Each structure stands twice: as C-alpha cells, then as structure tokens.
Amino acid sequence: MVINKWVFVYSEGHSLIKNGAWFVGFTDFSNVPGMLNDILYINRDGLQICYTTQEELDRVKEEGKVFFNETYQKKFKKAIDKCINNFIMLYDSYKTMNLRKLTNKELLCLFNKYIECECVLLAHYQVGGGRSFPLLEKYVKDGLVKQFSESEFNKNCTLLLSSHEIDILEKEEISLLDLGLNPSDEVLLEHANNYSFQFYNTYEIEIILNFLKERSKKLNQDYGSSKNYLEKKNKRKKLLLNEQKKQFNKIKNKKLKNLILFLREQGKLRLEYKEWKAGEEYKFLELFREISRRIGISLKEYLSTYKIEDTQLFLNKGKTIELKERDARKKIFVYFQKDGKKQFASGNKAEYLVEKILGKSKNKLTELKGISASSGKVTGKIRIILPIGIKEVQEDMKHFEEGDILVTTMTQPNILLIMKKASAIITDQGGMTSHAAVISRELGVPCIVGTYNATRILNNGDLVE
C-alpha cells in the first residue's frame, strides 16, 4: 500500500474514546449509507487524521444516490431524530444520578448506553459530511445553471441553500445576551450545559468560563440586548426569505426543488445535531470524571489514553492500563480497518503500521480544488487554524487579523468568532451542508469546502485571491 491510494477524509481533535466511537460509527452500521470498508485513523498528540481509499469514496458517493428518493430522505431524518431523542432521554436520566453511589457494574451500564448512543449518532451524522451528497449537490448546481444566467448562478445557489430560520448558533447567542452584562459563574455553566456544542475537546471549567465571559462582553458591545439582536437577524432573514421565495418559484423542476429543500434542511439540522455530536462529552463530563477517579488518574489522562474497551474492562474486572502504554498512546495511536479486519496500535507499533500503510512518500501536494459553498471574490492572507479545543482557539484569535482567510480541516462552533473576522473560508472537509458552508452563507463570505488538502498546500501568510 502506498500513499497515493489513500486520501484524506477529515481531521480534528479527539479523545481516545471519541476516536473509537467514530471508528465504530464509520464501520459497523451496514444499514447506514457512507460506511467505509477501508479506513485509517492516525492520532498524533491529540489531533487525528482520517484516511480512506479513493475507491471507497467513489463507492460511498454512488451509495448517496439513495437520497434522490424523497421517501428515503424522510426515513433517514426519522432515524437520526431517533438517535438524538435516545441521547436526550439518557442525558435526562443521567442528570438525576448520584454517580458516587453507583457500583462499577452500574457505572458500566451507563457508560455502555452512552457509547451506544454516541456510535449510532456518529454513524448517521457522517452521512452529511461531504461524501454521500456530492451527486445531489451536482444535480442541484447543474439544474441551477440551466435555470439562471451565469451572472445570477452563484448568487442564487448561495441564496437558495441558505436557511431563513434562527439556528442553534443564533439561539445560543440570544441566550447568552439574555444573561445580562455580568452573569455569575453558576449561570454561565448552566448555559454551557445547554449549549455544549461549543466545548468540543474542552474540559477545563476556567477556560470555559473565560470563553463565555469574553463572548458575552463582545455580544453586549455589538447588540446591547437580545431584542436588538433578534431585530437585526429577523430583518435580514425576512429579506432572505422573500428573495428565496421569488427565485424558488421560478423553478419548475419538482425534483430540483425537493433536493434544494432537502440540502437546505440538512445544513440547518447538522448544526442542531452538533449539540450531541460535538457537545456530548461535555454533557457527560461527570461520568468520565467519576471513572477516572476510580481508576486513579486525571480526567485529561483518562480521556487521552483509555479506549472504550479499556473502560469496559476496568469497570467489569478492575484492569487498568500501564503507564508505559498510556504514554505511547499520548504520542500516537492508530485505528485501522482493511477488508473488514480491525486493528489498534500505539507507539512504535503504530508508527510501523502507518509506514507500512502509507509508505515514506514525501511527494509534494500541489493541486487544490474544492466545492464553492458560498460565492464571492476576495484577496487576503492565509491563516491556518486546526480544530482542537477552546484553549487553542483563544490562542489562535490573538494572531488572526480582520480580513484574513481562514483555512482549516473543518470548522466547529467554537471558532465562530474567528469565522466572523475572516474574509473567506477554505476547508479540507465538507460539502454544501457542512458547518463551514452554512455559516459562510449566513456571514456572506466566500467559502470553498472539500479541498481535502488546503491545510497541507497553503501556508500561513500566503497572499491568495
């Protein structure tokens, strides 16, 4: 196996447990489109990169044809809604528990239910990540090219795929404004639990409080109140809705209209789902804190070194992971599946496996292409930011200047402040319904998604148009 047979899928910061759940979510659900027979996860120092083969991506793209069927669209939405509802019911039950009083077997039962909810949700969430919808997106773009003139196409494509409803990011900002100028720490932490999607890969209370206080101050400076915020947003969304209706009614192709509505809805829903895709670890943080306490290690150590199976083994039989193995996993670990055979390795064994799979190729990547998710033309300096956690985001904010072009593997809600300063956004991952695509259309800035390698071709400080 050599490197040109394996292609980038996505990259972000993960705990080891979350990485394991993603691995299961990508491989173990044959009833969900987008499963990968061949997949490689490499996690170095907490930042992982996922690869698969081009053949797998081509197959998954073909599988995506099922979404041309309106009945299947509804079936899929019903399935993912069920995933969310199951997670909510588990969380409601979890909040009433005194974890200290649970036996190890009772804690194991709770942990297993959490993992089951997480894996099923991730299996469904990955469908809209830019791999299953390309044929739908192509059909929509081709249809709009025929419908509108060349000068109108980009503007109307962006317009028709934009949501005119208040989304979860805006609801969170409204809620934060409603807390007033100087909310207490207790009130802010309650807010954090209600909108935990922002705290992906972030576990330190002090960092979370500082992040919310900074944002609260900025929102109050910009808007003064949630009433002013809503008036401004609603005015814009009313104009958007009126123009949408005007352009949408020009389209006579019923199939095209259905797919526009489906992709628009998927973009909005993927934001809503992030509360449980990106915020679930924070919501269940006390569960992980209790497990790490019983093991006798810090929360950070636990999340970076314990697999799902390790936690199950500890809670069932009391077996722990040796320090040497934990240290190896902090440096590098690998999940790999080829032809249905699964492997996990860490440390030197992981390095050997990566070299065996990818080879030592140092071929320089030069080609950059992607999907235009929001039209426009700008010139600016490149600033590469990787989605790890709030601590890293706050450090990146210090170096990101107004008008810089944001380049990242994929965007998360916790970099929204940076996205608002960007003159354009470029991502390795994603499609027309991705977070970057949706937010760029709301912000009215150009966006290119699904480049696969922008973070590896472009460099900080590069001036691009």
Would you name each region that the model predicts?
Residues 1-465:
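Non-catalytic, soluble scaffold/interaction modules
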